[in-house]
Amino acid sequence: MFCFFFVFSCESSSPPSPQYRRDGFVVMDGLLSPQECDQLRQRMAEIVDEMDVPDHCRITFSTDHDEQLKEQGNADYFITSGDKIRFFFEKGVFDDKGEFIVPKQRSINKIGHALHAYEPLYKKVTHSPKVQGIAKKLGLVSPVVLQGMYIFKQPGIGGEVTPHQDATFLYTEPLGRVMGLWIALEDATVNNGCLWFIPGSHNSGITRRMVRTHKGTLPLTDFVGREQQYDEDKFVAVPVKKGGVVLIHGEVVHRSAVNTSDDSRHVYTFHLMEAQDTRWSADNWLQPSEELPFPPLYTK
């Protein structure tokens, strides 16, 4: 299904909040220049060239329920990545000995979850005046940065992201306090795996959560609640131009398809939480640490 929606400019004085409240997402053009996008991609290419991942840390990333429990649920490498920069791979990129069978640059699904803290270029974007301005237009008083990730959506093999709500993984009390910013470093199209949303679905709450299990037990995370089935006809495609950003409400249902095209779809994405009068769940897989408390978005 396709629909028409208003695309805001990051230079506009018009607040995006009415559409964000109505649909659960907003597209804004021009957050980054083409040159800034290229700089972020070049820095990421350098990080990948330099990576050295031990065999036992070579796990794949998935949003599928069963695969997620098998891979991330049993992996200390995943659950302790909140204050580190770590690598998560596409399916089918290793042989039975754990060696790459595709070029390293084409093997990675995502890198996370602390790019916003430890990589200067990504930190600069995260705390940029434009990002702070967007947060202020939406009325955020004390936003903090929860995590920062780079998603590759590799050409030909970039994995499907099944329908989900971010609050399943990033739960707060009350709900409605988490927002994702999804920045397209290349054009995101229907062909290379752009996002699809169910407009207005953020008004229906959540039906399941991913939580930490008791210490010393496996898997390290588990799901509570039921996995919702969604009507495919309700999803709308949301293409984004290079340098644009999608603001994503924590409870809006969204997904992306497998990238079967010859084009990658690189994205830098991070999540904010309104910290004022909000409780971050101690059951969430992601937890602040002594090394990296959730940093305030607003800088002096």
Briefly describe each language-model feature range:
Residues 33, 184-186, 273:
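Solvent-exposed residues in well-ordered beta-strands and their adjoining turns
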Residues 8-21, 29-161:
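Non-heme Fe(II)-dependent double-stranded beta-helix
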Residues 19, 237-239:
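Residue-level "contact hotspot" at macromolecular interaction interfaces
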